């Protein structure tokens, strides 16, 4: 929010070897009117314009961009790997065997199989939920056998001591959930998938069998299958963490095998970003298709929505893409490598400065609202696109007064998104003619905030896009659950008042919890049968897998100085055996070769890594855009400083 890299005003950058978008264009900051006029001059009817969406932007913004450029010219702004993984996940959630659970459902599971994920670093809230999940079965046993009321937490904790419910983890490296796991299996992604397929076969003989499985894995698969089969609420968790479609399909097979007898099994997928699933459901072409379009001369102008391609694709490929395109327009809130190459940069608000909708990994549509307003040239992403469409005479944009209107058109184009209309009241919603106040009653000190400038309190900002007001004034009762801005009740402080907003203590909010599920699985998808071969490690080439870090791997949070201090520096992780095999004993650094790119990285010893596997931190500054899993070569170096060659 307060980063020095925030983009606060439109900017025009003239290329030295390409014609400008407008003959009167001048380099430097520009007004919103001027920059729209410049863009209008080039985005004429028949121009070859493509749009690249964003998994961290709202459904409204992505759909607006898709409408501007047309469905055939809309590309999902994900890496090729994430595109394949998210397409597979979306299809399984639509047609698969089991529903996706909410966080509360995860807490209530009584047996869990995690396949391929480091949840603490990739989905930390889910990891926290699992720490509560493993207490579920011991608590139920204590309540049933000892007749202890579940609300009597001290007695329940004394009764269960350190007992834990069954949690099985299969991951490419040791995770921080190992202390609560009944068993942990560390292996390459293909071997993780083979274990998953074997568990599915143990649960249902109709599922494809795995040939050549070592005896210890046969025994482990039988153990996992037996526990899941006896559970009342089994849960399978997988996702995009280890970058393997086979792992995702194996998790689907396990869930299908559990559901064959009507068992209420659930299947949860972790996804990379806040709206990754929403973008996948919206649909579009891959980033590789966009690169080919530009290379073949089929692209005049590229409009990028809240996306830094240098984090998703190797730098050389992005450089070629931006060179092949005649003009590049970037809509973003934070400057990066991509905005530095854009001819036109349009500043958009962050999640705290705009309204919109997103779809989480459960498939639940959720609405977010402005926390505060701003008084500069920033706009919501969809507003820039709408204003540009209006200047071009696009009829759809004429009726887009706010997010509600865009969602109405989205639902008309994609009926499966109809629950988006129900996730929050429309912008015109009022209770007794009043808006819902954002500010709590204790915000009365606001009158002194600007007293050094003027003793006259300024008029609160208007918000025509939501039923909320930027003031204390408004309806004082309980609003609909999706519009609750704070919890307070007489005699109850802060979040302690939550029980006054619930149907019952610990239950859902009155009127239902916010959000609506978009997807219910049809169950018509059969078993996947393409089982990968066992991983064969080679001494001259290793499989490089991503290591995620809760502090540092996420694109925007790492820009915060506090988070950046906790983020690790780039490294290459190896086990002790391969350090010796590769001649790295005593070496501080190693050279990693991925294709034509060479990285000099400090060596980090991780004894739990399987043979033939090495790891690098995903998304860490200095390693952005590195596409893994991938095969790579590692060799000793004598240089004393890390870097990229």
Residue spans of the language-model regions?
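Cofactor-/ligand-binding subdomain signature composed of acidic, glycine-rich
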Residues: 1-48, 107-111, 115, 123-127, ...
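Short acidic, glycine/serine/threonine-rich loops at helix termini
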Residues: 12-13, 61-66, 85-91, 124-127, ...
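A cross-kingdom feature strongest in bacterial/archaeal respiratory oxidoreductases
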Residues: 40, 66, 101, 111-114, ...
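Gly/Ser/Thr-rich loops at beta-strand to alpha-helix junctions
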Residues: 50-62, 118-121, 240-246, 309-310
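Anionic-ligand anchoring segments at beta-strand to alpha-helix junctions in alpha/beta enzyme folds, i.e.
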Residues: 52-101, 252-284
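A polyampholytic, Gly/Pro-enriched intrinsically disordered region
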Residues: 91-110, 188-194, 205-215, 282-298, ...
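Gly/His-enriched, cation/cofactor- and phosphate-binding structural elements
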Residues: 233-244, 248-290, 295-298, 302, ...
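Non-catalytic, well-ordered alpha-helical segments in soluble enzyme domains
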Residues: 381-401
């Amino acid at each position: 929010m307060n980063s020095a890299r925030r983009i606060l005003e439109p900017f025009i950058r003239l290329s030295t070897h390409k014609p400008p978008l407008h003959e009167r264009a001048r380099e430097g900051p520009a007004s919103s009117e001027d920059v729209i006029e410049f863009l209008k001059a080039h985005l004429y009817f028949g121009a070859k314009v493509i749009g690249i969406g964003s998994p961290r932007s709202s459904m409204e913004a992505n759909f607006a961009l898709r409408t501007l450029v047309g469905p055939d010219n809309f590309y999902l702004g994900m890496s090729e790997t994430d595109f394949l993984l998210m397409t597979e996940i979306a299809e399984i959630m639509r047609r698969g065997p089991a529903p996706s659970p909410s966080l509360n459902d995860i807490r209530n599971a009584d047996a869990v199989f995690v396949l391929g994920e480091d949840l603490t670093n990739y989905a930390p809230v889910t990891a926290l939920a699992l720490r509560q999940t493993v207490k579920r079965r011991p608590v139920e046993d204590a309540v049933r056998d000892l007749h202890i009321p579940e609300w009597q937490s001290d007695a329940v904790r004394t009764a269960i001591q350190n007992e834990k419910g069954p949690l099985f983890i299969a991951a490419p490296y040791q995770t921080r959930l190992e202390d609560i796991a009944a068993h942990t299996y560390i292996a390459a992604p293909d071997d993780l998938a083979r274990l998953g397929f074997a568990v599915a076969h143990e649960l249902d003989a109709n599922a494809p069998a795995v040939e050549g499985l070592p005896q210890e894995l046969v025994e482990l698969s039988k153990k996992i299958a037996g526990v899941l089969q006896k559970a009342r609420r089994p849960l399978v968790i997988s996702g995009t963490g280890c970058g393997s479609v086979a792992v995702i399909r194996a998790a689907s097979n396990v869930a299908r095998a559990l559901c064959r007898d009507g068992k209420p099994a659930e299947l949860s997928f972790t996804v990379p970003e806040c709206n990754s699933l929403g973008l996948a459901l919206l649909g579009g072409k891959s980033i590789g298709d966009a690169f080919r379009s530009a290379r073949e001369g089929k692209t005049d102008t590229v409009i990028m929505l809240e996306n830094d391609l240098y984090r998703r694709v190797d730098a050389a490929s992005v450089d070629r893409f931006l060179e092949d395109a005649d003009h590049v327009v970037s809509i973003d809130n934070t400057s990066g490598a991509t905005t530095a190459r854009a001819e036109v940069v349009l500043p958009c608000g962050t999640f705290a400065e705009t309204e919109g909708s997103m779809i989480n990994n459960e498939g639940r549509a959720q609405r977010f609202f402005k926390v505060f307003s701003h008084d500069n040239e920033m706009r919501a992403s969809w507003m820039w696109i709408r204003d540009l469409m209006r200047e071009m005479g696009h009829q759809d944009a004429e009726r887009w007064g706010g997010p509600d209107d865009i969602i109405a058109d989205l639902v008309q184009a994609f009926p499966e998104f109809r629950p988006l209309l129900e996730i929050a009241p429309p912008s015109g919603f009022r209770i007794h003619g009043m808006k819902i106040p954002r500010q709590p009653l204790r915000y009365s000190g606001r009158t002194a905030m600007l007293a050094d400038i003027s003793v006259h309190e300024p008029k609160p900002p208007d918000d025509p896009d939501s039923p909320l007001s930027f003031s204390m004034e408004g309806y004082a009762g309980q609003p609909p659950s999706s519009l609750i801005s704070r919890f307070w009740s007489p005699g109850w402080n802060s979040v302690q008042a939550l029980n006054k907003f619930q149907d019952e203590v610990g239950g859902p909010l009155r009127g239902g919890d916010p959000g609506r599920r978009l997807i219910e699985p049809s169950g018509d998808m059969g078993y996947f049968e393409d089982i990968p071969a066992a991983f064969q490690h080679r001494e001259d080439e290793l499989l490089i897998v991503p290591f995620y870090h809760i502090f540092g791997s996420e694109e925007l949070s790492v820009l915060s100085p506090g988070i950046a201090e906790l983020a690790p520096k780039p490294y290459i992780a190896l086990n002790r055996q391969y350090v010796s095999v590769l001649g790295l004993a005593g070496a501080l650094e190693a050279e990693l070769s991925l294709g034509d790119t060479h990285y000099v990285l400090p060596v980090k010893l991780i004894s739990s890594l399987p043979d033939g596997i090495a790891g690098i931190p995903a998304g860490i500054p200095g390693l952005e855009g590195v596409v893994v899993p991938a095969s790579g070569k590692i060799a000793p170096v004598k240089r004393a400083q890390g870097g990229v060659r």
